[in-house]
UniProtKB/Swiss-Prot annotation:
The keyword Membrane does not apply. This is Hypertrehalosaemic hormone. Transmembrane segments: none annotated. GO terms for biological process: neuropeptide signaling pathway. GO terms for cellular component: extracellular region. The modification Asparagine amide is found at N10. Keywords: Amidation, Hormone, Neuropeptide, Pyrrolidone carboxylic acid, Secreted. It comes from Helicoverpa zea (Corn earworm moth).
Length: 10
């Protein structure tokens, strides 16, 4: 999950 590893897509 790219959003999860990036901090919820922030």
């Amino acid at each position: 999950q790219l959003t999860f590893s990036s901090g919820w897509g922030n």
